[in-house]
Every structure is written in C-alpha cells, then in structure tokens.
Amino acid sequence: MALVVHLKTVTELRGKGDRIAKVTFRGLSFFSRVLENCEDEARFEQAFRWPIGSQVDGDEMLEIQVFNYSKVFTNRLIGTFRMVLQKVVEEGHLEVSDTLIDDNNTAIQTTISIEIKYQTMDGSVKVWSDGEFLDIPDDLDGTFQFETDSLLSGRSQSSGTSPGRSIHGIPTFRKAGKGVFSAMKLGKTRTSKDDHKKGDDAAILDAEDLDRKAMRLGGILDPDTISLASVTAVTTNVSNKRSKPDIKMEPSSGRPVDYQISVTVIEARQLVGLNMDPVVCVEIGEEKKYTSMKESTNCPYYNEYFVFDFHVPPDVMFDKIIKISVIHSKNLLRSGTLVGTFKLDVGTVYTQPEHQFHHKWAMLSDPDDITTGCKGYVKCDIAVVGKGDNIKTPHKASEADEDDIEGNLLLPEGVPSERQWARFYVKIYRAEGLPKMNTSIMANVKKAFIGENRDLVDPYVLVQFAGQKGKTSVQKSSYEPIWNEQVIFTEMFPPLCRRLKVQIRDSDKVNDVAIGTHFIDLRKVSNDGDKGFLPTMGPAWVNMYGSTRNYTLMDEHQDLNEGLGEGVSFRARLLISIAVEILDTTSAEIMSSTEVHMEPVSNISESATGKMEEFFLFGSFLEATMIDRKIGDKPISFEVTIGNYGNQIDGVSKPALAKKKKEGGGESEEEESELIHNSSEEEAEDDGDLTSVPSTPPMKPVITDRNYFHLPYFEKKPCIYIKSWWQDQRRRLYNSNIMDKIADKLEEGLNDVQEIIKTEKAYPERRLRGVLEELSTSCSRFVTLANKDQNLSGRTKLDRERLKSCMREMESMGQQAKTIRTQVKRNTVRDKLKLVLNFLQRLRFLADEPQHSIPDVFIWMISNNKRIAYARIPSKDILYSIVDEEMGKDCGKVKAVFLRLPGKKGFGPAGWTVQAKLEMYLWLGLNKQRKDFLIGLPSGFEENKAVKGIGIQAVPPISLVYNMKQVFQLRAHMYQARSLFAADTSGLSDPFARVFFSTHSQVTEVLSETLCPTWDQLLVFDNVELYGEAGELRDDPPIIVIELYDQDTVGKAEFIGRTFAKPLTKMVDEHYGPPRFPPQLEYYQIYRGNCAAGDLLAAFELLQIGPAGRAALPPIDGPTDSDRGPILPVPLGIRPVLSRYRIEVLFWGLRDLKRVNLAQVDRPRVDIECAGKGVQSALIQNYKKNPNFSTLVKWFEVDLPENELLHPPLNIRVVDCRAFGRYILVGSHAVTTLRKFIYSPPDKTANNWAHTGDIVVNMSPEPNIKKMDTVVKIEATTDAVVKVDLNEDEKEKEKKKKKKKKGEEVEEEEPDESMLDWWSKYFASIETMMENLRAQEAAQAEAEEREDLEIAAESAEIKADDFPMKGTKPKEKSKDKKSTKDKKKNNDGTEKRPPKPKVDELMVYNKELESEFGSFEDWLHTFNLYRGKAGDDDDHNVVDEDRIVGRFKGSLCMYKLPLSEEITREAGFDPNMGMFQSIPHNDPINVLVRIYIIRATDLHPADINGKADPYIVIKLGKSDIRDKENYISKQLNPVFGKSFDIEATFPMESMLTVAVYDWDLVGTDDLIGETKIDLENRYYSKHRATCGIASNYSVHGYNVWRDPQKPAQILAKLCKEGKLDGPHYGPGGRVKVANRIFLGPTEIEDESGLKKQTEEHLALTVLRHWEEIPRVGCKLIPEHVETRPLLNPDKPGIEQGRIEMWVDMFPMDVPAPGPAIDISPRKPKRYELRVIIWNTDEVILEDDDYFTGEKSSDIFVRGWLKGQQEDKQDTDVHYHSLTGEGNFNWRFVFPFDYLMAEEKIVISKKESMFSWDETEYKIPARLTLQVWDADHFSADDFLGAIELDLNKFPRGAKTAKQCSLDMVLKEHELPTISIFKQKRVKGWWPFVAQNENDEFELTGKVEAELHLLTAEEAEKSPVGLGRNDPEPLEKPNRPDTSLMWFMNPLRSIRYFIWHNYRWLILKALALLLLLLLVGLFLYSIPGYLVKKLLGA
C-alpha cells in the first residue's frame, strides 16, 4: 500500500525568488528540489511516495507548504495547502488545483496543482458519486448549528458529524432547492462549559477549501460563476472585528453646528384673488424675509435668493419650521392680507437627496379656512447645508419641464400630491413622579403660618407641532397632576413636520421652566404602506429625562430638560395618547380654522396601560477602575436608580407616598406589609422584609497611576437590588430586542464583508451570502416568536398595528435576503452590499419602540453626597426573558460601563477623561422570575446576605465573595501608531501610550516629535487576577483601554486619544499555535471625543498562568539584532515579516512657506523619513529667488512589512537652516498610506498586444472594416461630440441626419455662422449637460427599479401588497406622470423639442477640474505642511486649513528590491532619475495666464437688503487686478463675461486666487468668497491642462482654434514625449499612432469659403481619443468651463456661491496666442411689441343704472409688459356697454430689451428712490391684458385678465364664439406659438377671474393683434399710440348710449326695452296675432257656414 503525491506546479507567485516545497503526511515530510529565480510560476514536477502499513483513514490530512528559500535566513512561508483524503480513499486517484492559505487561514492568489494516487492491496476504493456529497439526510439538520464565532474562539464542535467530513463538520451542501444552510440559530447557543477544553485542533481547515473541492468534484472549475456557487456561504467572521469593541465616549448630539439654509423664490402661479399685489414671505424660526412686491398679477416672477445662517445643535435645527406665505398688498402701513401658506420642517429638506428641493412648487393653503382648497403655488429652491456638506447644484438652465406643477410639487418622495386636512388629537391624562421645582424657603414660611405642606410644582403640558403650540391648564401644587384634556391641531396630512414635541412645564410668575421634554416621531407611530395605519399612540406612558432632580435656581443642565442632549436623570412620566382623523372638508359642520384648541376628555382606567407588576433589578460591581484623580481623595459610592426608585438623594417627593401605597411602590413599612398580603404565600416568607439596597457602601479609592485611581474590591464585590412597580409591557421591549439582535448580527456581518473587501481578502461574496443566510433565517424566527404572544392586556392600537407591520416587513426582508443571496456574485458584491445596508437601516428604524414602558437605569458615581458622573443603560438591554432571542443583549452579562460627566460638562476636553470604568453585571426581570438573577455571573462566588437566618434563601446578596480566581499574564504588543493628533505648537507630538487592564496600567516609552510613533514594544502585565470561571473569561475577556498622551516638559501630559481592545485568551490547557496564536497585529481606531484621531497597530494576548507558573508560558523571542535595555521589542511571529524596499523621492520644490518665529524662511531643506531610514533633499539656497530644488531625485532603502496594510507612514519634514548650524522645523506632513506610490511594472500582456496588428477606431455606425477591430471616422458633417462606442442616441441622430439628407424638410434652419457667438456654444453645452444628467438619473432610477423588480420576481411567494420597499410606489407614480406628459408633448406637434441646431459645444463641468482629474497629481503631488496644535471640535476657529504653513511638491515611488532588469534596460533610461523618467526640468518658466470669468451663481448676500454688488478680484504672485469699476449692482447671480491676462513666472507665482468682493459705497468692500487654483500642477500635468482641446478645428468664426499650437503640432510633441511611433498620416483620411488607426475628414474651409487639404482634423481626432493610446494615453482636457465653489475663510466649509470660469496658460517662449475670445455678456436686443385692441365681447356687466336698475359696464382695457409701474397703458373707455361688447381700435406700443438665449426681458431701474444706481432685472416676457370697469367717483373695478407668455401662448381663436375658458385652463394641452417666431398674430383670447369659490370663470373676451418688430424695423415704420399718427387707426363705430336719456329717448327705449324684453314683446305680438286670427275665425265662421249650407 502506498500514497503517491505528484506535485506539479505552483502558479501566481508574487515577486522573484528561490522556491521550495514541503509535503507532509502522517508526520513524515519530504522536501522538493529548490527552484531558483522563479517569478510567476514554480514547476516542481516531482513525485513523493509514502509506503504505508495501515489503511488511510478518510479524515487524515495531507499538507503541502510552499516557501521562499534562503541560504542564510530561515525559509519564509508563502502559503499552505491542506486536504482531507476522504475523496482519495474512495476514488483512488484525484487531480486537484487549489489556492493556498496563509497564516491567518485566508486564501491567497497563489495556486497549486497536484495529483494523488492511493494504491491499496485489495483495490477496495469505492466510487464516490456527486449526489452523495450533496445530499445530507434531514435528520442531521440540528447537528450543524455550529457557532458563528467558532473560527474566532477556536472552539470546534464536531460532535454528531460523520467521520471524514471537514474538521468543523460543516457539510456545505444539501440537495439544491432545499434551502441551503441548516438554520443558524439567532441567539448564541450556549455550550457546555467544558466544551472548549477539547483544545483547538491545530489545523483548522477552512470551510471554503471544502467548498472549492466539492465543486471540483462535480467537474466545475470557477466556484462563483455558476448556480451551485450560491450555495457557498460563510457564516463565520473572517476578520477579527470582535477584538475591537466600539464604545463612543462623548455624547454626540447637543453640540451647536453651523447651518446655512438658502431659499430661492422663483415665481408664483395661480394665486387666488383679484388683481393682487403679491409679496412672498419666507420665515424660518423667528427670522422673516420678504421679496419685492409685484403689482396686479396672479403669477408674479421674483427669482430672489435668501440665506439664513444658524449656529445651533442639529436637533434644534431640524425641528425648525420653514414657512412660505404669500401676502397680498403689503406695504409700510398695512401688514397685508394672507393668501396662503406652506409649511415644512428643516429635517424634511435635509433628508432629501443632496439636502435640497430644486425648482419645486409649494402648494399654498389658507390656515384660516381649510375648506377653500389650494390658494396657489410658489416655485422655489430650498437647500440646507451643514458644515462640510457638499451640495451639487443642478444647473439653472432649462425651465420647460418644471411648468408641470402637479408633477413637480414640493413634497418628499412617497407623499401623495393630494394632501388632505386632518385633526391631530393629543390627549394628556396625567403625570407621575415630578420633581420639586421651587426652593423650599417660601414653602417653609407658608407652612409655619398656615400649617399646610404643599407640593412644590405647578405643572402644565405644552404640545408643539408644525409651528403651532397648545397647552393644558395648570394644576397647582401637584407632583401627580391629572389633566384629562386634549390638544387639537389641524394640519395637512401627511404632515411635512416629522416630530411632535410634548413638554411638561412648571408655571411660574417670572418665567416658566421645562421639567421634561419628549419628542414623538410621527414616522414611528404610523405606516404609509398599503396596509399601513394613521398615526396613533397609546394611551401609553412616556418617560422624560433631563437634569438631576435637585432644584436650584440656576440649573446648569436646563438644556437637558428642553430635550437637548442626553438626559442624565429620570424627571417624570406622562400618560398620553395620539389619534388622527382625516377631515372631509366638504361637510358643513366642520370648523374651518386651523387654530389650536383644547377640550376635556374622560379619564381612563388604571388597567388601560397594562397590568401593574413588581420588577426586580439586581446589579453587581465587579470592578471600578480608572476613577479620575480629581475625585480620588474622598470615599466613593455608586447609586443605581430606575425611575424614582433607588434615588435616595432627591428621589420620591414625600407627600406623594401616600398615593403610591395604593399602587404599591414606595418604601414605608405599612406599604411593605400591604405588599406581603397581596403576594403569594411563599413569596411573603421569602421577602420578609426585603427593602431595596440601591447603592454600594462608600469606599476610598486607591491609586493606579498618576492619572487614575481604582476601588479595592478584590474578591468582595458589592451588589445592589431594587424593587419597583411598572405596567407590564415587556412584550414591546422583547420584540425590540429581537430586532436589535438581528440588526447587530447583520451589522457585524456587513462590517466583516467591508473589512474583507478593504483588506482584499478572498471571497467577500461568500461571506455576504452567509450574512444574508443568517438574516433570512432570523427574520422567519422573528415572525414565529412575535406570533406566539397572546397576552392582550394593555395592548394599544399602535401595539397591534406595529406588530403587524413589523411582521410584514420582516417577512418581506427575509424573502428579499433569500433572493439577493442567490444574486450575489463576485462582481456584484459592492452593489448588493449597498442594498443590504438599507436593510440595516430599516431594522434599526423598526426596532425603536415609540411607546415606553420601563424607564432607563441610571448609574451615578457619588462622592461627598454630590453626583459626579453617570451612565445611562436602556432597560431593554438588561431585561430578562426565558427565550434567548428576547433577552436584552446585556442581561446577565458582565459589561464594561464607562461613566461620563453630565450635560455640557461632557463636551470637549473635560469630557474626554474617563470618570470611571466599571465592570458590571445587571439583571432586570419580574420579581417572580427572580430565581434566575445570578445566572450569568462568573461562577465561583459565595453570596453574602444582609440578614442571616433560615428561610431567607431568596433574599439577594449585598455582596459576592469570590474564592475562585484565575491568574493571567497580559501581553500588549504595541507596535506603532499613525496619523495622531498634533498636540504641540510644532505641529507634532511626543506620544506615549498607557495601557489599562483591570487594576493594572503600564506605559510605553515616549517618542519625541512624531505623529507616527513606532514603539515596537511589548508590555507584560504579570499576575493579573481575574475572578470567575476560566471558560467564560476565554470567550469574553475584559476590555483593555489604551490611552495615548503627549508628553510635555512642563505640566501634565496632554490627552491625545483613546481606543479599546479585547485580548485573545489562551487557557493553560490550550496549545499556543496556529490558527489562533500568535495573534496578528491589527489597526484600532483612536478616538478623541467623537473625532477619529489616528490608528494604533497592536496585538493583545491574555495567557493563563497555570500551576507550573510562568515557565509554562510561550517564550518571548524578540529580534536579537538590537539591544534596547529593559524595553522588550514585539516578538517574532507577531511583528511583521519585512522585505527590502527602495523608496525614491522626487524633490520638486516648496511653495507658500509662512514665517517661523516672525523670520522668513530662507534656506529650507526637506527631510524624508520612513521606518527609521531616510534621505535629505538638497538645500534651497535662496527660497525667494527660486523655491525649487536643484537635485530632483534621491533614494534610500528600507525594510518594510510585506503586508501593505501594515506599512508605516512616511514623514516629510521641512526645516529652515539658519546661521551657526541651527535649524528650525517649518512644518511636517505624514503620508499615512504608501499604497498609491507603490510601483507596479507595466503589464506585459498589455505590451504584447501592441504587435498583434493595428487597431482601427471608427466613429460611424457602418459595418466595421475587417482590418482587426474597430475604426475613428469623422465626416465633416457629423456631430460635434464624438464617442468611440456610438450609443443609441447617437445612432438615432445619425439616422435622422440621413433622413434629412434624403430631402425631408428640416424643421429649423441651420443657424447662420455670423449669428453664433461664444454664448451660443455655452448655452448649447449647458443644455447637453442637463440632458446627460437627466438621462443618467433616468437610467439610475430604471436600474434601481429593475433591481427591485428582479428581487420581487424571484421572491414570488411574497403577497403582492406586502412587497414594495418604502419609496417604490411614488417612483411609479412620478413615472406615469412623466409618460403622460411625454404623450401630451408628442400628440400635439408644437410642444415637441425642436431638434437642436448644430452648434459646436464645449464641456461644462459642474465641479472644479481638480476633482475630475485627480487634482492633477498624475506625477507631481502636493503635500500640505502642518504646524501648530490641531483644533478640537469646540475650537471651531482652529481648522486644519489654518495649520497649513506651506506645501511640498514632489512625489514618491517605492518598489521591492531587486527590480527586474527590463525596466533599466529601456532606451534612454537615466539612472539618476530612477523611476521618474521623462520628467520636465524645474527651472523657472514664464507663462501667460489668461483667466476667463463667465458668471457667478447663488452668491451669499452681503448687504442689508439681501443683495450684493459683486465684482472680481484676481491675485497671482505680485499681480492684483481689482475690477471695481465694473461692479454689478444688486445681483446675486451676476454675469461677468470678462477675461484677464497676467504674465507669471513659475514656480514663484503659481497660486491663482479668484475672489468675488461686494462693492460698498462707504467703508471697505467685503469678501463674498474666493477660490484658489494651483496653476503649476495644471501646467505640468499629462492631462495637458494648459489650453483645452476644442471639439472641432476651425480657423475662423465663433469656434476659432485658440491654442497657438495646432493639433498636428500638439500630437507630434505628445508622440515624441511618449516615445510613440507616429503620427503617420496616410491617404483617405487616416492617421496611425502606435498601433491605432484613426479616420477623419481632411478638408477645411477658410473665411472666403475655399476648401483646402489639412491634417489638423485627423490630429484632433487622435487627441480627443488620446486615452485609448496604449501605455502613455490619458484623457486630455477638452475645451471646457469649470464651476468652482467660492469659500470664505470666516465661514469654513460652507459654500458662499459658485463661479463659472476657465484658465488658459501659454508658455512665453513659443509664438504668442491670438487675442482672447470675446465672452462679454450678450447685449439684450431691442424690440417693439405693438398690441392693437380691436374689440371686446361678453364682458361681464358690473354697474346698475341709477334710474332703471339696468346692468351695464364702462369698459376699458389695460396692458403692460414689464410691470404695472413701468409701462402700463390704457385704452379709452367704451361707456355704457349693455351687451359686454366694446369697440376700441386702440394701439399699445411696448419697447423692450430682450435676451434671446435666456428668454428674458432685461430692465434697468433704481430699486428705490434712495438707491445709488440702477439695478438690472431679468423677467420673463409676459404680456398682461386686463379688462376694467371705469367708475367716475370710486376706484375702477377689476373684471378679468389674461397673461400671455410671449414664448409660448395659445393661438387666438378665430371668432369670439370659439374663444373659451379652456384656452387658459388647458393651456398645456393646446398648441402654442411664440411671437418671436410668428412675428404677427391676431385672434380672440378670454379674460378670466376667480369667483367666490376660487374657481376660474370667463369674464370677457378680447380681440387683439400682436406685432413684434426689432428696433430697426420699428424705426423704419413708426406708429402712433392709441389712434394717433403715424398710421392712425379709425375711430370705432360705437352705439352712442352715454347720457342718452335726455338726448335720444327713442334710441334709449330701443336699448333698454328692446334689448331686455325683446323675446317677451315678440311672444306677446305672436299671441296677439294668434288671438286675432282665432277671433276673426269665430267671427266669420257662422256666416260662412250659412253660405255653405245654403249652397250660395
């Protein structure tokens, strides 16, 4: 019998070296031969044979290790391959290729190939089928619930698995389709205590190897591309996140922050009212700002920008209400009448994408009358910017889309556009446990006189919601007031204000103060889904927290009672309920006002809130360390309180006790006895006289070290216990706990996945699958647990609804998790990770229970009867349940608790010192569950009770005495720290670390002047005594606290930061070896307050000292090469493995160095240091003359860790060399990550394909030329923007063009070249940018939707209505809207977008170029140099910017030695320049800098009137241009259109500052904002940022080529610099560069129209696709405009506006460029609009005639274009129209200036009579026509109006009959015309006005003719106003009915009688004739009859 292993190859090795392999089986090892100088692959091709005596067992192992071989040192392990031989035993022969794993059990890239044969004597090898491996019998399910942290803890649970599976016994497959993993249990399954003693199996095989093998057995090679792969899920943590407890020390909320709210009021539409003069008021909090007033219009246009600045805590900010109101005819004397308002809170805006609403319509409603409906719309932008928020401003270009008001309402996503009015009922029943709020002096006086003892508080409740307040009555002198009142608010539903604030206040004669505050988030008490519910809550108790209960006149923590910051003590609890009722506003009996009103409500029963239960809280203090030394001199005790129970200093106010007795809940004797009677018999015996013990006995602290003390508890641990009575609402907390645990588990898993991705470990997708696996299992477990609960007492509506919705959500989440799990592939990990992060947010949201039950527990440290520091522990975290999942996460566990100072004291440096660290055990449960309260304590203690005797077993102990203790040694391997806080004025620190563990502490050595200390020190803590059972300490060891300090020569060390860690624990009986030991170095994040302050690289291990003493511990073998005295270095095996690296440094120059100690820097030098080695630059002899270095490249060699993540930082220091050999530190910079500077040799494969044949790049969609691949072809006609892969749109465009060529009529003529200018190009480009943005957004939305649909489709089991995640429905809604809108547009041909005229375009970047092109640091990097102490959060004034004292320009390149020779053998390799080949010289160079400033947008107002008078200031070196004369008056969006030329010399003048200042008539001008541009980096960048490459080459016209070098010259230069072959121009418009061929046009037209041959187009094609050129290609900067934010140093981090500009640079040693492009603002064109009012008809009749009561009107028509004040014109009056008909023949003439590109009229006028100069306004071109009734004595009456937008208005009707109201109401659906295109138009238009019901009605019709002429045309054919010459109009033929009673009675009779009674008269006449006929008939018939009869 023998086992033969054929070792074939090992591939994907890193670096170059000698390799050797070692193959081990049954303890016998063979070594392979040594392969020398292997690079990528080692071909061993060797066989090893083991003759064996006994059969090979299925679970025996084969191990192969691959090493780097070294003759001198020990061989270094590359990786290991281990394999279980089960498959070999069964099949006899196997070929395997698999990846190796490293020491950490992580798969690495290196792959091994082997072949194994097993020869048995009898040939008994079974055939092994796939099915067997995949099918696992169901009955085994239970046994595979292995622990999730088994990899971490090293515990191996292999019981119950069949032999021969993996060591873990984790069968990874079951029959596909059965649901893959056996369900992971959510709660941690407790294992028997002796489990771990089995010891760690030394070789844990990674579950993943099994997975891979299993796949291969099925003949599959790539594990993650196939469906089976989705089976591979890893549910154990891969990264060791457990060792990093995340403990936040400082309260995060409550600290004030800078906010800026900007509101742009653009316009209003459809305002309700007649002939109004509207003003818009924007109100935020107390501040109000108003727009200007617009006269006589219902759709005013404002475009005014307002800014509000705040400095408040976030919570206060987000609760502020933004109120937008429209007021009619407000002036100095009158406040005006309110038209309507719109309200939302700041938080709603902040939660929007980008923190803003852009161009949305706010719907106004009338707060005084809710039955009226919509009162109009205001279009506005609202943005909320916090410090450091970066807001992308959408470009302010096209406004066509936003006219659809309904589709663009200012509402968050998910809120329906039709909001209804609703009543919000807040019922206030009663309160309990109020603190006293008056000093007792007066009370004592009163008591002495009157003899009564009153409660010292007069409470009432204040409720605030949506900017309104309501309050209850005041209950005098009552600690337990009963109100039974309700506050009723009327507000739109859903409301846009998220929180409701309920506050108990104390009524006082001087000022009322808050007792406690509670916020109710409406989103948490409602659900907006299909099966959702309206906001509802209670009746439930809410707990209020705030300052401590002792009353002082000046309470320093009063803010806490107002709800700011975390409450530090229980204040009271309040019984409330909330309900909402949607109103039907049509019903008559409804109250129409929105005022808040109060009503009494009936009392509710005691039991409504749940059954009263007795709760028991037990706590034990196992350790109290790190007590701040300030309080270390007096005895200290700890007090634990829950509600008012346990509070001995200022707890229950005595008079209230009598009441408490009824409920059971106090401390007097009769109460106890009463309780005993109520309780069951045995309890009565047990509890005999159980009184609470809420505090520990005082004890004097003992010193730990110079900063901290500890309490000497040793083996005697004090305990506390409290009995309290609360309503039993544990179910709420249980559900919350389950969800919290699921969320914690999910968060841990996701952090792990992120860590795997970050550290580039293998298979993050498997871990993510495992996470989703666990999530879906946990969700289904939640549903079963939540379903079980049947206890209904005290259940509120919210409880029931919330449970239903939580179950629905969890079910759907579980389904989605299952679905997503199947979609996780290697390439989708990041996307899916984002999706799963949404789950986490949803879980956290669901877990937050809005209805409180048991108050939180507070632990106070008390010294000298004063409260010093506290910790607050949510009661749900320590709540006990028999079901594991429902138990609080800290219940019955020992936890580290850190105490902190209360309130504002906890902010800033004072709050950073730990006040005390407690190791504490807490348990809270029902008194009847009390038997379990000691269940989780570390075992080995005896109880010490207060009372001795029989029958008191159940009395809790007052202390525990531990007899069992374990002795440990802690080893803290402190390797290094990086990016520490700069604590000294030099900008550096002298850091040392202090490590605290239990009651011990030690320090590292102090390293001076560094922010990245490498201590490399092992701290050994001997004889650390820990109490408790060994196994528990192993699984959950105590926390280690590491604090970093800066050593100061004088005074005490300054705190730098703190981090926490947990050690890896080894018990005596465990083996010290892989995979758990030795521990790996890890980075721990250091925090200073809430700010990250660096990282610590360290490892910690806790080793149990057994009976053999320290001798048995693993030896400490440090490196032998250095002797550091008593300091132990970090031992081998833990310290990183080092390799030799060379670091090359490019020294370019220094810039902007500030003075040091008032002296200028003259002779600076740069020192570079990394890991103890370094290099110095050459000395700059005269910094002023030339700040560049003479020697460019230097290098040094250094040993660095092979693991890139452990690389130490590189330090850059600049020193100034002064006389007498002194040198002074100027500034320093630490490069924390060297990763981006690591040199990677160019990919050989990339070089090889250069020889495979030419690649032709083609631009046209025709079939590709068959040369090799693709071809670039640009005809002279194609579109300006060329992309290599033509996307769909472009193909469409091409098709369209071809159609056009075929002779189809083109809709819009090509614009004439002479008409076009630079601005045409600019506006066309902006439109393109907007279209691209829109397309991107649409694509993104579509992708998201598709993703949702995929998930929905795959999880089809979900009931249709449960599925949608929040926010999917509204999307669909908006999509429908869009599609209907599009349909509308397409049905009528006019609204379709006209095809864009062909204009050459440029690139508009809506950010600065630097962010688009990596700050132009492609080879030259800028390192900021810092000096001075870093600022903390509260030193708002010290920002990092202020610490910058200069910049070092240079670069780094590091690579492993030795370097391959190919690189150095390259042609022209300069050994002096190392890796920095082909870098230009850094000699001074003269450059012409040309700066183009286009415009600024959204400037911060600088004047009192809310405007600014901006002008441009440009600084570069000594040049300083102030364009003060050309300031632009009162503009926040000024168009500058200027260019400036400056000559500069690099490097002395390289920082360009462009600033916008505000011009002031008196005093100095203020800076609005500035932006800085580093021109040098741009100049030298490979992206060629000197002058943008235009899209087309033209020699004349608006798009003339502006670079002095033509494209062909540029291309030739680039090819030469990049050592490329080419350019070779060939026939047929081809050019070849390297191996690419480009095609393009070859002719050019000059000004005279002659065509000539040119290569420029071809060269330009190559330049525009330069990034595709192999090896040297990169994107060249196109012709562009960049948008840069303006910042003001006084308001750091908040944008003050934006500026659009670009910069060109031209070297002075080449031919000079042509003149600058003219970008001066377009002058508006002068037009004249002539409006002839011919007739009116059907005008409503307003006047009653004095004599006859007859209706008539005296009609005249008024019109204006710019504004009523500016150019109002009236016709004459048509008196006494009885029919509504009026004849005028009257001409209005309106001259105006018009900007075609912006479609705006430009007016210049003085803003007020006091204004210094005229202000320019741009307003839309709208013609207003109104019809009025003239009155002689009173004011004229307004009858109706029409407003025509001259760019698009409905075509007039041909006759008055066809003219209808629809022309106004359905304007969007009708075809529209533009007067600028039609020039002349005539027709009938309706006049409209609103009636009493605010509905539009027709009030008349007007026949008018509009005629537009340019100023020149108007001059040639002048006309007169009215009916005057020239070209007079004839007088109308009016019926003369004025004053005619006396003049012409007949005519008037005709008018009055005939007009009104004509039908009556006609009917009467007809009747008369009929009667006459009948009479004549009757009269003549007898005679006629006689005649007939007689036959006469």
Curated annotation (Swiss-Prot):
Region entry Disordered, spans: 655-699, 1288-1311, 1354-1399
Source organism superkingdom: Eukaryota
GO BP annotations, alphabetical order: neuromuscular process controlling balance; plasma membrane organization; response to auditory stimulus; sensory perception of sound; startle response; synaptic vesicle exocytosis; synaptic vesicle priming; synaptic vesicle recycling
Topological domain ranges for the Cytoplasmic compartment: 1-1958
Coiled coil regions in record: 1282-1363
C2 domain: residues covered: 1-98, 241-362, 405-536, 952-1077, 1124-1250, 1470-1588, 1711-1860
Matching Gene3D superfamilies: C2 domain (2.60.40.150)
SUPFAM superfamilies xrefs: C2 domain (Calcium/lipid-binding domain, CaLB)
Any single Pfam family the record assigns to this protein: FerI
GO cellular component: basolateral plasma membrane; cell projection; endoplasmic reticulum membrane; Golgi membrane; presynaptic active zone membrane; synaptic vesicle membrane
Positions annotated to bind Ca(2+) 2: 1503, 1509, 1558, 1560
One Gene Ontology molecular-function label: AP-2 adaptor complex binding
Cofactor dependence: Ca(2+)
SMART domains reported for this sequence: C2, FerB, FerI
Binding residue positions for Ca(2+) 3: 1503, 1558, 1560, 1566
Binding site for Ca(2+) 4: 1831, 1834, 1837
Family to which the UniProt record says this protein belongs: Belongs to the ferlin family.
PANTHER family in alphabetical order: FER-1-LIKE, OTOFERLIN
Notes on the domains: The N-terminal first 124 residues can be classified as C2 domain, based on their 3D-structure. They are not sufficient for calcium ion or phospholipid binding.
Job of this protein: Key calcium ion sensor involved in the Ca(2+)-triggered synaptic vesicle-plasma membrane fusion and in the control of neurotransmitter release at these output synapses.
Protein name, UniProt field: Otoferlin
Gene name of the record: otof
